[in-house]
């Protein structure tokens, strides 16, 4: 089966995806499809490093601002909407360029229906659930949560089987489908995805991350979180558990000072970048590009036009 070709530019946070993707899109009449699990949310702009109108520079962007902050958004829903965007872009004679660092979104597109397996994994969700299990009556609360969304799996699991309960809840949060009803058969991807991943020296990346956090704070990150809470967005909803938001909430409640908050913002973002790179190394047939090098764009240009992986 001949499948239509799509290009994917991925990489950890602060690796330079936005600038390089805009340059590539302008050169090849591309429209960008966002592949970021946080930029889908409206009103969450600063903490998600959402590209500004100026940064977009006239390039159409899709899959940004498609959900409210208090709305649950599954990877299955992303897959369906992103594929519809790609098909529409191609139908208009343009090319789709997917850009973002959410690995399980890419996996779901490249391996459709494999949502109950490796494609559905998010360490931040897992860590949250595992922490809950350590609290008073945590195992019981975890089991009750599972029973509400997936009674069949809950009935099969012993109260002490925390690992499987966490896994089942993780899959449900990511896919919107109970673990017991996850499809078992993987189908062919609708499109062929050609992937390039940005990287750079770790110390340089971490320095860029710290500067980005400082810039976000200067741009009004604290005020953005305060505004979301004032509008009634629950502090414990999926979107507010994201890095850049969950650290600010205790600060606004007077439960931590700014020194600790700033430290956690930078530490958690560095850890997130490390997890992103770990995930991306699992992908096959990927061009790795050091975005700090002068020839980074030229390598991407060659990859785009010739399919070069060297």
Q: Which residues does each predicted region cover?
A:
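Phosphate/pyrophosphate-binding catalytic cores of soluble transferases and nucleic-acid-acting enzymes
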Residues: 1-310
